[in-house]
Amino acid sequence: MAALMVVGTSSHAGKSLLVTALGRLFHRRGVKVAPFKGQNMALNAYVTAEGHEIGHAQAVQAWACGLEPSVAMNPILLKPQGNMTSQVILKGKPAGVCGAVDYYRDYFEPGWQAVVEALAELQSQYELVICEGAGSPAEVNLRHRDLTNMRVALHLGAPTLLVTDIDRGGALAHVVGTLQVLPPEERALIKGIVINKFRGSLALLQPGLDWLAQYTGVPVVGVLPWLEMALPEEDSMGLFDRRGARKQAQLEIVVIRLPRIANFTDFDALEAEPSVRVRYVSPDGYLGHPDAIILPGSKATIPDLLALEASGMAAQIRAYGGVILGICGGLQILGSTIDDPEGFEGHPGRHPGLGLIEATTVFEPLKITRQVQVESRLPAGEPVVGYEIHQGQTTFAPTLEALFAEPHLGVVSSNRRVWGTYLHGLLDNHAWRRHWLNALRERRGLPQLPVQSGHYREQREEMFERLADAWEPHLPIDGFAQLAGFASQV
């Protein structure tokens, strides 16, 4: 098996998007290619067909490679849940909750074993594996326990690309500093520098690139133009850059940016709707008068509920008279009570919810992770696909109407004002999303949008193609293939 490694000078340098683009470019050339990230820290998770949790970014990369996601592509997922702790997902299943010190002490050896086993599995199935690092490989205080950067590259002997974000400023210094910090055996694997998010005159930049290559001895192999892509962010920091401006929007939908927001990829398809403005509001923000509010998923539902109460946002939501949709943790928050008898989210106890639907939630040891294909009851007969990731079990009052043929997946109030579902990816289903939006439009006296079958995955495929088309002229794919050792096949 051949391998390439992509590391970055910092978080948000563009590693994930570069792996996605390379995956699609090699896939288009007929190469059996797969993505890999040994350890990911993110609250955007995806559930594979086997019921394993992996980072959503690796699922996106798998789709770009023309594959169904598998746990081998991301054997370790860390899901931050506040108080400097994270839930450890090892080989797709929960393994415990711990802080950083305990994690490095207790999970390094089993974690590395999981990484090695996953790589061996991918080696047996694919011609090329494109590995992604995390953060920066130059964190000297963490190198001895690093499971996902140059340790992986050394294990595979993988030629490595170093990507940097020039839009932030200081990119050349970031590259120089990163290379100087790396030990000689790791630096020797860095075969190319990729400049990302460039906008401006390449002629003005070229002297700097020439100096960088001469000073470091590593060639600059790509200068990637700035792209406005709707592919998912890996963590919630990207939400702070989403302003929601859209002049032609006829509907405004507010998503409450919970402190521990999870799976905000649920709103990618909604943001792609030309007639919809999605605005993210923090608990201490002003709700305004949107057409609908969405309470998203949360990695720590009770602390986020308490944050809503303490900030006054809970009172704003209760006083709001429009449509509200709760997804997963958001559904639990909308209910009457949340009971955590064993203290999975901290101290044991029962907490009152917002009380907007008659529903009680109890947190239990068993975590449900599964893909779902189900028929919708509202609208009737529409096929819907999505996935569940939750620990709580919710009991609904009989006065609530089931949204799906599996009643536990979601309900709506009799006045069609409060909706709740455990189904992540629900809004990716075109017909269901358009029916829901048309109900909002009807309240405003707006004409109905056409309702077509299909799924957001078709739009995602178009984005993969646009990404590959935009970056192919700026990346020496034949050269990368030669570096990886299979030039004759491309």
Swiss-Prot record:
InterPro entries, per database record: Class_I_gatase-like (IPR029062), CobQ/CobB/MinD/ParA_Nub-bd_dom (IPR002586), CobQ_GATase1 (IPR033949), CobQ_N (IPR047045), CobQ_synth (IPR004459), GATase_3 (IPR011698), P-loop_NTPase (IPR027417)
Where the record annotates domain GATase cobBQ-type, the positions are: 250-432
Q: What are the record keywords, sorted?
A: Cobalamin biosynthesis, Glutamine amidotransferase
Q: Which Pfam families match?
A: CbiA, GATase_3
Q: Name one GO biological process term.
A: cobalamin biosynthetic process
A GO molecular function assigned to this protein is: ABC-type vitamin B12 transporter activity
**What functional role does this protein have?**
Catalyzes amidations at positions B, D, E, and G on adenosylcobyrinic A,C-diamide. NH(2) groups are provided by glutamine, and one molecule of ATP is hydrogenolyzed for each amidation.
> Which protein is depicted?
Cobyric acid synthase
Lineage per the UniProt record? Bacteria, Bacillati, Cyanobacteriota, Cyanophyceae, Gloeobacterales
Q: Which gene encodes it?
A: cobQ
